[in-house]
């Protein structure tokens, strides 16, 4: 029976205890960080020949992290924004390690000195007034589903809410948002 490596133990503590309980991050953040480390482990296995059961904290070096980030860009064809998200996950883990594995503080500082890439901000495209008017005239208001669709489209237009935010609305939540008057 093999025992977990120091990398595996610290990563489990980071994901299961620190992020979940101490930092109370969202499930989406937790999932994104987990994905970043699944990819890092895959990189270390395929490119560095280090199997997951032999992956130790000594393998978490500035050189390996930079290699991983370049691999994301060059071989996985990810965007600089994705690279930056993966780097943020590694930075968070290394910041956690600074207080738990102080013997390697010098290496942790080197990893934390890796900078994010500059990314281009994408311009938002907006619908013209004519396009919005056309969109709001699409639902068939002679049937209840059409009136419902028009109400949801109007609410999204008037509030700037996203589709998921509208989908997540409940009657009790909408009661505090909408006030009906006679």
Describe each model-derived feature in a short phrase.
Residues 1-182:
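Conserved catalytic core of the tyrosine transesterase superfamily
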């Amino acid at each position: 029976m093999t025992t977990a490596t120091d990398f595996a133990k610290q990563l489990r503590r980071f994901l299961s205890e620190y992020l979940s309980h101490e930092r109370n991050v969202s499930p989406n953040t937790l999932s994104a960080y987990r994905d970043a480390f699944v990819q890092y482990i895959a990189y270390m296995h395929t490119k560095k020949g280090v199997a997951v059961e032999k992956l130790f904290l000594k393998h978490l070096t500035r050189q390996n992290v930079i290699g991983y980030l370049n691999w994301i860009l060059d071989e996985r064809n990810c965007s600089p924004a994705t690279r930056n998200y993966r780097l943020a996950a590694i930075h968070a883990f290394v910041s956690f390690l600074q207080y738990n594995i102080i013997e390697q503080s010098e290496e942790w500082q080197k990893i934390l000195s890796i900078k994010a890439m500059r990314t281009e901000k994408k311009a938002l495209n907006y619908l013209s007034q004519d396009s919005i008017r056309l969109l709001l005239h699409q639902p068939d208001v002679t049937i209840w589903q059409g009136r419902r669709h028009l109400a949801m489209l109007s609410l999204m237009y008037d509030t700037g809410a996203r589709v998921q935010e509208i989908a997540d609305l409940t009657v009790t939540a909408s009661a505090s948002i909408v006030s009906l008057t006679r």
